[in-house]
Design a protein with these regions (language model features):
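Structural motif
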Residues: 1-5, 38-41, 64-66, 97-101, ...
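Interdomain hinge/lid region at the active-site interface
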Residues: 152-218
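Conserved beta-strand termini and adjacent loop/short-helix elements that scaffold enzyme active sites
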Residues: 23-25, 86, 121-123
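Hydrophobic beta-strand residues in large extracellular and virion-surface proteins
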Residues: 20, 35-37, 107
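NAD(P)+-binding Rossmann beta1-loop-alpha1 motif at the extreme N-terminus of oxidoreductases
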Residues: 1-30, 150
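Rossmann-like NAD(P)(H) cofactor-binding subdomain of soluble oxidoreductases
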Residues: 26-91
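Hydrophobic anchor at the start of a short beta-strand
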Residues: 19-21, 83, 118
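Internal alpha-helical scaffold of NAD(P)-dependent oxidoreductase catalytic cores
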Residues: 8-12, 16, 76-79, 91-172
Length: 218
């Protein structure tokens, strides 16, 4: 398996016995049955373009972006690749997608092989998933405020700061560009939940000093 970057999925596949080649020249992808595209979101189009001349008919290609379905892999599919998507959500749950039945069977097998539970999702469900994951990530702001209150009262709590603030699992760091954040905001159908989300985004920007990248200011 050729992987564009090291990731949770490539590590898990290596754990169950797959030979993984990470961060190798793109030309080497042609020698692998499975190509895993797990680059940060802004770099995915460039990786796909670089891979296009090297992809062969029947080769499996999988990306790990939450915000994109398999359509982003169209340039590789037209060259005969079996295209799939899988993203880790929480615990053993992975959301998946594929362009055809072979892809569905393959991605289900890969995720099941690492002990995961594959959950097929449609593209229109992805903004809701992104909103849920972003809200989980923003929980950090609440935990940090709570920790700062406790630190003034409980001596020695600093040694437990990491566990208190982050918990057992850190949600994926999703892109924070204006379009992505507006997609996430629009996914909150419940006005109260949207207001909570906006408040947490505002709290994060106050703490980090980062201006909001779009026209809608939280």
């Amino acid at each position: 398996m050729w992987a564009s970057h090291g990731s949770t999925l490539s590590d898990e596949l290596a754990r169950v016995g797959h030979a993984v080649t990470a961060d190798a020249p793109v030309a080497e992808a042609a020698n692998n049955d499975l190509v895993l595209i797990d680059a940060p979101a802004p770099h995915i189009p460039a990786v796909i373009t670089a891979l296009e001349p090297h992809v062969r008919h029947g080769q499996m290609v999988l990306h790990t972006l939450l915000g994109e379905g398999v359509q982003i892999l169209d340039p590789l599919e037209v060259r005969g690749a079996v295209v799939m998507a899988a993203h880790h959500i929480f615990d053993d749950f992975w959301v998946t997608a594929a362009a055809d039945e072979l892809g569905k069977a393959t991605v289900n097998l890969l995720i099941s092989e690492i002990g995961g539970t594959p959950v097929p999702v449609a593209d229109e469900q992805r903004p809701t998933l992104m909103a849920a994951q972003r809200l989980r990530a923003l929980e950090y702001e609440v935990r940090l405020d709570a920790y700062n209150l406790l630190r003034g009262v409980i001596p020695g709590i600093e040694v437990k700061a990491e566990d208190f603030i982050h918990g057992s699992e850190r949600p994926y760091a999703y892109p924070e560009d204006a379009a992505t954040l507006e997609t996430i905001r629009s996914a909150f159908a419940d006005p109260a939940a949207r207001e909570l989300y906006e408040g947490l985004e505002g709290r994060r920007r106050t703490r980090t000093g980062r201006p909001y990248p779009g026209t809608h200011e939280f």
